């Protein structure tokens, strides 16, 4: 951890000194291999190098809540993707065109990646939509169960063992690259870019691809999938949930007022005015202890 902290802080120092990071220029956020911890380190470096900037917390988003972060940022991308999928299934005409089953829960889902995005997406799909997730892919292999994986149990296993392997939730396949070749109705690449390319695009057997990762399909493969009739929901729309919540965090840091504070004050002021009106009308006084 110390080595990672030193690397992060050194890199952040160089970017900040060159003017590449500030609340008004570039505002980084977590991605593959990083978390709120690294964002907190970057914020600390910015504060030490720019002590005069009162908006220093807005130099980066995805921070820990105690460091100026916002509730819900960690799971925002995954939850946003689930909302996108739900919205797609509300459009029955598009669902029919994609040759999918009308109800989301009746479709087989494969998710590549079980990190921050994939894990929260799987959790929402499983618990909110009763979805059938038949395969989860990670760096070391694939967990497959044609009857559907118990996502809640898998999350417990991963938190304890740090791997999707060594459990009784399904069959483990040791070739992680085969995840995009698993036959399914909905394929969700939620890890790295370029996972669907000229080497495997012809082996993709799905009806709908939801681009949870950034650029998981290369341009040439995108054309091939289009010609095959595969519906693709683009990453710029699908994974915007994280960016949206990052914006709210940024605004909160710039305004220096947490969300709900102004509304609370407004409601308090409105209540006091109502009490004054009642007192004036009835010629009575309200116990001050009741107003507190």
Model features per residue range: what roles?
Residues 1-105:
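Glycine/serine-rich phosphate-binding loop and adjoining beta1-alpha1 elements at the start
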Residues 2-6, 33-37, 41, 72, ...:
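Conserved active-site and cofactor/substrate-binding residues in soluble primary-metabolism enzymes
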Residues 4-23, 43-54, 85-93, 116, ...:
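Structural signal for hydrophobic packing residues in well-ordered secondary-structure cores
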Residues 25-28, 53-56, 135-138, 188-189, ...:
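General beta-strand structural signal in soluble alpha/beta enzymes
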Residues 30-31, 45, 63, 114, ...:
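Fold-independent oxyanion-binding glycine-rich loops
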Residues 68, 72-181:
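Glycine-rich phosphate/diphosphate-binding loop of Rossmann-like nucleotide-binding domains
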Residues 88, 207-292:
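Adenosine-phosphate binding glycine-rich loop
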Residues 141-232:
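Rossmann-like adenosine-cofactor binding region
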